[in-house]
Amino acid sequence: MIEKREEQKAELKENGELDFAYSIAGFHRVRFNVFRQRGTYAVALRILSFEIPEAKRLGIPPSVVDLTNRKRGLVLVTGPTGSGKSTTLASLIHIISETYAKTIITLEDPIEYLHPHSKSIVLQREIGYDSKSYASALRAALREDPDVILVGEMRDLETISIAITAAETGHLVFSTLHTNSAAATIDRVIDVFPPHQQQQTRIQLSGVIEGIIAQQLLPKEGGGRVAAYEVMLATPAIRNLIREGKSFQIQSMIQTSKKLGMQAMDDAIYDLYICLLYTSPSPRD
């Protein structure tokens, strides 16, 4: 722990900011963001529970929970910073751990939720402490015989490329992006690659993607916040749109595929409003 603190002090001094999590016995786990301002330091705190929230409590749709039964492929949870992506992923990983005897490796910056071993073995690596980067940790994970890999964030071309390869080679990969819809997520992944690689990437992505969940947090009746989820599932029609570069048609496909478990964001928000969970009088604005 002393060694880690010295590394964190050096990082804070060099970069002017530091993001980390710390467990306080008998209280909670806390995520800290320390940053320099006007010659001194400030800190933003986020309280994390030791208990991993259940999917039902979070309002995660059953079709999303069903993605935990996949043996391979890529599942992306997207949304703006602070929209609850890490909590959603923690809940899904917990379901796998409680249901199957698998090896799960999580790569996080920092580690937020602590996963106990259950039927699965859960190995959690922190970027900047246990490994230098997401890309290097993900590359190493492929040699560590996991069944499931959680990548906290796909930040660059190298990480995205390795994540796709991992999904192609028989792993179930979960990760996040800062995009607001399934269509925008597909475009973001493709656009990271050089033009001459984009068509091949479309083909690869269409073959490995299993689902994209875009989420946002909305004010809740009586205080607090509630999550709304857009859900895209990789049907043959969706895979074909990705392969042909027609991501602009994905939204309409989601809207017409509700019976298959898909859900448009507008519909999710409207349903929350009808259930009196969302306070806005104009949920479709």
Q: For the regions a protein language model found, what residue spans apply to each?
A:
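Short, flexible helix-loop junctions that flank or precede catalytic/ligand sites
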Residues: M1-S280, R284
